[in-house]
Amino acid sequence: MKLTCLMIVAVLFLTAWTFVTAVPDSSNALENLYLKAHHEMNNPEDSELNKRCYDGGTSCNTGNQCCSGWCIFLCL
């Protein structure tokens, strides 16, 4: 019985400690995510989802065009 109570107290303490030591800005995490999504809807050209790159075996000019980042006349 004592061991069970001790385990419950330990779990509650560790749970509380996790919340206390969490990232200070975590309370605004959803708000920041919403603002970022709203910005991407207003400026679709700036969205990271619109990033286009070439798959391996496709001809390329620079490494920036390849999804892997490696270009030697063909994306690697």
Curated annotation (Swiss-Prot):
The reply to whether Membrane figures as a keyword in the UniProt entry is no
Where does it localize?
A: Secreted
Signal peptide annotation: 1-22
> Does this entry carry the keyword Cell cycle?
no
Disulphide bonds annotated for this chain are 53-67, 60-71, 66-75
GO cellular component terms, alphabetically, are: extracellular region; host cell presynaptic membrane
Chief subcellular location:
secreted
- Pfam families from the entry? Conotoxin
Residues that make up the propeptide are 23-50
Q: Identify a single GO molecular function assigned to this protein.
A: ion channel inhibitor activity
Keywords of this protein's UniProt record, alphabetized? Calcium channel impairing toxin, Cleavage on pair of basic residues, Disulfide bond, Ion channel impairing toxin, Knottin, Neurotoxin, Presynaptic neurotoxin, Secreted, Signal, Toxin, Voltage-gated calcium channel impairing toxin
Tissue expr: Expressed by the venom duct.
Task performed by this protein: Omega-conotoxins act at presynaptic membranes, they bind and block voltage-gated calcium channels (Cav).
Entry comment, domain topic: The presence of a 'disulfide through disulfide knot' structurally defines this protein as a knottin.
Family the UniProt entry places it in: Belongs to the conotoxin O1 superfamily.
Q: What is this protein called?
A: Omega-conotoxin-like Ai6.3
